[in-house]
C-alpha cells in the first residue's frame, strides 16, 4: 500500500479480518514472508520501537476495544494524550470537529455501555482519524449498514489521502464494492484465505 492510497477489501469473515489487521500492525505473527510499515519489518523491531511506530496508525476495531470504566470521550483522547505532544485544547478541538463531521452533537460523555451502537460506531471512526495518522485500518466501520456514515467516512479518508496517508478498509457490503463514488485505488476480495483482485462484474 503506497502513500495516498485507499484499498477496499471485501470479506464477510469478521474474525479473520481482525487477525489480518493485527498482522498488518505487527500484533500477530505471520507464517510466511514479512510485513513492513514505513520500511520497518515488524518482526525485527523491539517492543518499544513497534509501539512508537503504531502511534502513526488509526484503527476501527471490530469489537470496539473500549475501556468500559472510562467515558467514550476519555477513550478517544487518552491514547493521544499519552503518545503525542499535541496540546490538550488542540486535541479536544480536533476531536469535537470530527464528532460534528460524523453527526454527533459533541464528544460522548457516557460510558461505552450506555452509548447507542450507532454512536459508538461514529466514536470509533473519530478515534481512528484523530491525530493525523499515516495509516488507517478500518474493520467494517459501517457494520450496521448505516449509509449516513459513508459520507463523513469518505471525507475523513480523503483528508488522510491528501496528506499522503493510506487507508485499508474491510467491508462486508457488496454495494460498497461496486460504488464508484468510493475512489479506491485497489479493490480486493478474500476467498479461501487468499487475496484476489475484485472483478467489476461481481
Could you tell me what each predicted segment is?
Residues 12-13, 56-66, 70:
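ABC ATPase nucleotide-binding domain signature
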Residues 25:
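Helix-to-loop junction immediately C-terminal to a conserved catalytic motif
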Residues 33-43, 139:
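Conserved ABC transporter NBD signature motif
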Residues 42-58:
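ABC ATPase NBD coupling module
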Residues 63, 69-82, 94:
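Q-loop/switch helix immediately C-terminal to the Walker
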Residues 98-116:
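Conserved ABC nucleotide-binding domain
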Residues 128-129:
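ABC ATPase C-loop
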Residues 156-177:
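Conserved catalytic loops of ABC-family nucleotide-binding domains
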Amino acid at each position: 500500500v503506497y502513500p495516498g492510497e485507499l484499498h477496499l477489501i471485501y470479506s464477510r469473515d469478521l474474525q479473520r479480518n481482525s487477525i489480518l489487521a493485527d498482522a498488518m500492525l505487527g500484533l500477530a505473527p505471520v507464517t510466511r514472508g514479512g510485513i513492513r510499515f514505513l520500511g520497518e519489518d515488524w518482526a525485527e523491531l523491539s517492543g518499544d520501537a513497534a509501539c512508537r511506530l503504531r502511534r502513526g496508525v488509526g484503527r476501527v476495531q471490530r469489537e470496539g476495544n473500549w475501556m468500559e470504566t472510562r467515558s467514550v470521550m476519555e477513550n478517544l483522547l487518552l491514547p493521544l494524550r499519552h503518545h503525542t505532544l499535541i496540546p490538550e485544547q488542540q486535541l479536544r478541538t480536533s476531536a469535537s470537529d470530527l464528532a460534528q463531521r460524523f453527526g454527533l452533537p459533541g464528544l460522548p460523555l457516557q460510558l461505552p455501555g450506555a452509548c447507542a451502537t450507532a454512536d459508538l460506531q461514529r466514536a470509533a471512526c473519530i478515534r481512528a482519524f484523530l491525530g493525523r495518522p499515516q495509516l488507517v485500518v478500518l474493520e467494517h466501520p459501517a457494520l450496521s449498514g448505516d449509509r449516513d456514515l459513508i459520507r463523513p467516512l469518505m471525507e475523513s479518508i480523503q483528508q488522510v489521502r491528501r496528506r499522503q496517508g493510506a487507508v485499508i478498509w474491510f467491508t462486508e457490503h457488496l454495494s460498497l464494492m461496486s460504488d464508484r463514488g468510493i475512489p479506491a485505488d485497489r479493490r480486493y476480495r478474500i476467498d479461501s484465505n487468499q487475496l484476489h483482485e475484485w472483478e467489476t462484474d461481481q
